[in-house]
Amino acid sequence: RSEKSEGCRFMVRVMDLEELEQDALKRNIPVMQKEGILFLISQLQDMKATSCLEIGSAIGYSAMMMVTHVEGLQVETIELNDERYQEAVKNITERNLQDKITIHHDDALSFDVSQLQHAPYDCLFIDAAKAQYQKFFEKYVPFVLEKGIIIVDNLDFHGMIFDIDHIKNRNTKQLVKKIKRFKDWIFNHEDYDVEYYQIGDGICVIKRKEKE
């Protein structure tokens, strides 16, 4: 009986999170595309992850999806935007997930890393300001376990990365160039192996190269 009620609770929570996702999309709040979040969850499940550091919480959707689907997972997440942070706290608390999700209201670039509560992590998930991907990576990769993974979302930026010359908006063009620079940098980095997946808006799974 308890397994059945657990299953019911799980389904209710998943449907509830889908409603949250739809509401966020209507309000133009950036949430990870469905196929992207399911891919992320499968990566965490495959490695039996127990800890994930997320850069960019938005309204808490991806963190809640992760802890709902990955048994025993703790997510620690950092959000800069005040409104989104407040909404994330509300969403997490309403669903009684505050024992599985730790959220910090701060700029991840200036965040005091001594405040991290669950380091080292099985996974670092970067889905925040795209122009800062390399800085986020360099700051937080030391807190990823030797066999851990780094997942970076949004690397195609709506396909624009393949057609930079035709972008009219100057700011958008600068942003896409920065994403491309990060992509080139990480793909050519001698310390990391990178697998690229055309899922959602382009996802990279990055692992440290095994030492010879």
Region spans (language model):
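A short alpha-helical cap/connector motif
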Residues: 1-151, 155-212
